[in-house]
Amino acid sequence: MPFDLDHALRYLIASEGSDLHLKIPSPPLVRLHGKLETIPGTEPLSPEDTIGAVQEMLHDPNKLAEFEAENEVDFSYSMEGLARFRVNAFFQRGTVSVVMRAIPVNIKSVEELNLPSVISRLAEEERGIILLTGTTGSGLSLIHI
C-alpha cells in the first residue's frame, strides 16, 4: 500500500500528536506525549515514499534548489482547515527523511495555557518587550494574547 501523506497528517492532528517522522525503513511515526508511536495500519517507508512526500509538499523552485544543493530544507506546509506544519526535509544515510511539526489552527488563550494573568496586562503596555521562553514542544508557538 503506498504511503498516504494526507492520512498521516490527519492522524497526527486527530491524535493530538506534535510531530510526524518519515524515515526509511521505519513506518510513519507520530510523537504522542513525548513518545514516538507507529501510525496503525502503516508499512515501512521506501525511498520513493519520502521523496514523494517532499515533492507533494514543496512547490517553491527556490526551496527545491536549496534542498538539492544543501541536502536539507525548512519550509511550511498547510492543509486548509486542519493545520499548518513546519517541515524539515533532509538526507540521512543517503535517503530522504522528513520531520513535520504541527502548528494548530486554533491558538490557545493565556487562560487555557494556565499562564499568570499578569501576562495579559503586560501585553497591553505600549512599550517594552516580553520574552516567553521554553523547551521545544512546550507550547510557546501556541500563545496568542
Segments (PLM) and residue ranges:
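P-loop NTP-binding catalytic core
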Residues: 33, 37-42, 48-51, 55-133, ...
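N-terminal accessory targeting/assembly segments
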Residues: 1-27, 45-49, 58-62
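Short, conserved phosphate-binding/catalytic loop or strand-edge motifs used
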Residues: 30
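ATP-binding Walker
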Residues: 138
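Conserved small/polar residues in nucleotide/adenosyl-binding loops
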Residues: 143-145
